[in-house]
Amino acid sequence: MSRLSPVNQARWARFRHNRRGYWSLWIFLVLFGLSLCSELIANDKPLLVRYDGSWYFPLLKNYSESDFGGPLASQADYQDPWLKQRLENNGWVLWAPIRFGATSINFATNKPFPSPPSRQNWLGTDANGGDVLARILYGTRISVLFGLMLTLCSSVMGVLAGALQGYYGGKVDLWGQRFIEVWSGMPTLFLIILLSSVVQPNFWWLLAITVLFGWMSLVGVVRAEFLRTRNFDYIRAAQALGVSDRSIILRHMLPNAMVATLTFLPFILCSSITTLTSLDFLGFGLPLGSPSLGELLLQGKNNLQAPWLGITAFLSVAILLSLLIFIGEAVRDAFDPNKAV
């Protein structure tokens, strides 16, 4: 903390003073960290195998059944009772706490899908027999990574467009504003539905489409800040000394605009996660079978006789978005110099 400037130290103190936002940040980081380690927490493959004096790492490498003394050269099925017994008799196996992956199906249960919570499936199974907790972990990772990438890409494009409009003004600003007015009126959802009938949606395809239509949220904030600061004396002096426009924008004007921009980022991230969840809920998101919070919400709606699906999905989304909103409020207070610690 000693390396921070006095201004940033005061901002950090104001952020920590907001206890709700401060602890929400830590809880969010812990949950996101757990989701990044989903393969170590929920997996239908062993993490480590000791067999006949040799070490095997199924999490990192695919082994055939013949590697463990089986008759077939096909990929080993670690849920096969015969292979399980053989591994236990000739060595030992380290399993993940949850023995189901994102696409695993619990064939051992004698209850119809979706089945209620049990010792095997702590939060029950979905309509396809997948473990709900495992799909929540993997779905949270996909949602947050999608949100972070969408927030980063759209923020860069929005800041760049707002900076150019605000700095140059005139026709650049006029035509830029007219273009944004037209572009923001495009029916994004209908375009996604139309394109989904032609192209199979995937993570990168959805990210590109949402970035293409979602970069305008920061343009107005950055543009207003550049319009305000471009007539300041130090900017005029830099222009008179022959400093390049690029240097003036990046070194002298952008840092001031970023103060307002940073306060919006947690809310943009929240909106980005909601976008993917909504598309998955409507059936125009990730491919069928992908772990997704929106897809689990859809299953909860379609299976009202299995309330654990809807309740689990709703709580997961609500907690995630609430944490981000609390963080955003704390960041906003931290950058407000009128807030007392």
UniProtKB/Swiss-Prot annotation:
Keyword list, A-Z? Cell inner membrane, Cell membrane, Membrane, Transmembrane, Transmembrane helix, Transport
**Topology with respect to the bilayer:** Multi-pass membrane protein
Q: Pull the Periplasmic topological domain ranges from the record.
A: 43-143, 200-201, 274-307
Give start and end of each ABC transmembrane type-1 domain: 140-332
* Pfam families named among the record's database cross-references: BPD_transp_1 (PF00528)
- Give the superkingdom in one word: Bacteria
Purpose:
Probably part of a binding-protein-dependent transport system. Probably responsible for the translocation of the substrate across the membrane.
So what family is this one in? Answer: Belongs to the binding-protein-dependent transport system permease family. OppBC subfamily.
Task: List the protein's name.
Answer: Inner membrane ABC transporter permease protein YejE
